[in-house]
Amino acid sequence: MAGLLSTFDTFSSRRSESINKSGGGAIIPGQRSTVSVFILGPSVTDDADKLLIATTFLAHSLDTDKQHSQRGGFLVSLLAMAYSSPELYLTTNGVNADVKYVIYNIERDPKRTKTDGFIVKTRDMEYERTTEWLFGPMINKNPLFQGQRENADLEALLQTYGYPACLGAIIVQVWIVLVKAITSSSGLRKGFFNRLEAFRQDGTVKSALVFTGDTVEGIGAVMRSQQSLVSLMVETLVTMNTSRSDLTTLEKNIQIVGNYIRESGLASFMNTIKYGVETKMAALTLSNLRPDINKLRSLVDIYLSKGARAPFTCILRDPVHGEFAPGNYPALWSYAMGVAVVQNKAMQQYVTGRTYLDMEMFLLGQAVAKDADSKISSALEEELGVTDTAKERLRHHLTNLSGGDGAYHKPTGGGAIEVAIDHTDITFGAEDTADRDNKNWTNNSNERWMNHSINNHTITISGAEELEEETNDEDITDIENKIARRLADRKQRLSQANNRQDASSDADHENDDDATAAAGIGGI
């Protein structure tokens, strides 16, 4: 039997291995599109010209009349301006199964009076039509930078801070967009400006060069549609040699942004390991957590097999990235989130009210995290030489710290979960009131939250979803009206009862209505 169980324990990891392994056979290349990339030739030496070209690339990348592949090519051209050898940058990081980059040079021609004196060319020929298309008149539907709304002088910024700082401010913001563009498009604009604040405070990005919200959304849309652009940026982070002592300021800033990009979309997976497994509490021995633990173990093996690109599994849309979703290990994730909201206050803002949340495991995680004995690591006791007296004092302090907070945290961010908690315990029948009293229900919302079973029926996600569908504004209005009528009737009956001198306390209790209890519970 032991051998049979061990076979099942390793099944998840072996199954994942078999899915990821190649079945052999010939490798058949897919279709690749051609993307034009423009780089600065040696004749373009003036800093004002360079900044003009950079803003031209940015403007073209936001032009909704162009194909997304063309817009992506302009963003690649902009990113390549950070390096002294754009060709080497693209050769090193731009190898991609989806696209083939065709490089064109932009040169300065003193004889030309149109197109700002620029010409697009290769070694063999010049491209007049491409030059006019690139440097011809453009209608910017929206300003690129917030400073343009205030008529800020970019040339003055260039003279004050220099070309590298101005170019770096633009490129860093493109990198910041990637942090949320793929994994959280709905929160892109807010996330962008939150991440940008640190770079504004240290002077990396000047206020006049801050992207507008429309610019951020436009770049994000291109990134979501052009996986080749995202792959290029990820390869830049993977191949960037962090041990170099001669990193430019822009490269250092790219690495800082890269720390936010790494493991983007894997927060649930990492938090489950951090709060669910690494805390090493006794709850991990529960049998209903074992399947999820085995699943998590197989995911760890998959993650490690990806090597340097493992942190970018989601942002690269790796075929296995869906396996890391918490819905594949819901019980363990729910338990870990319960531990997290107790141990880390910042995690109380994390969206836990999801359809696959296991309420029992979520509450169990909070319970064990609040328990003083569970907070003491037996593995470290021997290593640190902690005495029994010291352990008792530590338990005493932990109990005092957590003793005043007996409330359990509710899930956040999930409409179905919130509705289930807020409305399922609204009852108006006398039999329901008696049933509630028999089960020692209380009007205190915190105590009621700890005892989350109602009528011997634990709140389920499916029931919550049905309740959310059935509950509307008219239902809530009806409930409010019923409560108002009940309160009025109760007030009248209490007034009549006070006039009866021979009324007993038991009779008063029988006349007591449950509307007040329902209102006190917080059902509305």
Swiss-Prot record:
Its main location: virion. Residues 405-524 are annotated as: Ntail. RNA binds at K180, K190, R195, Y260, Y350, R354. InterPro entries: Paramyx_ncap. Keywords: Capsid protein, Helical capsid protein, Host cytoplasm, Ribonucleoprotein, RNA-binding, Viral nucleoprotein, Virion. Residues 490-524 are annotated as: Disordered. It is found in: Virion; Host cytoplasm. Residues 462-471 are annotated as: Interaction with the phosphoprotein. Residues 440-461 are annotated as: Homomultimerization. GO terms for cellular component: helical viral capsid; host cell cytoplasm; ribonucleoprotein complex; viral nucleocapsid. Residues 494-504 have a biased composition (Polar residues). GO terms for molecular function: RNA binding; structural molecule activity. It comes from the Viruses. The keyword Electron transport does not apply. Residues 4-404 are annotated as: Ncore. Belongs to the paramyxoviruses nucleocapsid family. Ncore is globular and carries regions required for self-assembly and RNA-binding. Ntail is an intrinsically disordered monomeric domain in the C-terminus. Homomultimer; forms the nucleocapsid. Binds to the viral genomic RNA. N0 interacts with the phosphoprotein (via N-terminus); this interaction allows P to chaperon N0 to avoid N polymerization before encapsidation. Interacts as N-RNA template with the phosphoprotein (via C-terminus); this interaction positions the polymerase on the template. Forms the helical nucleocapsid (NC) in a ratio of 1 N per 6 ribonucleotides, protecting the genome from nucleases. The encapsidated genomic RNA serves as template for transcription and replication; encapsidation by N is coupled to RNA synthesis. Forms the encapsidation complex with the phosphoprotein protein P. Before encapsidation, the newly synthesized free N protein, so-called N0, is chaperoned by P. This is Nucleoprotein. It comes from Human parainfluenza 1 virus (strain C39).
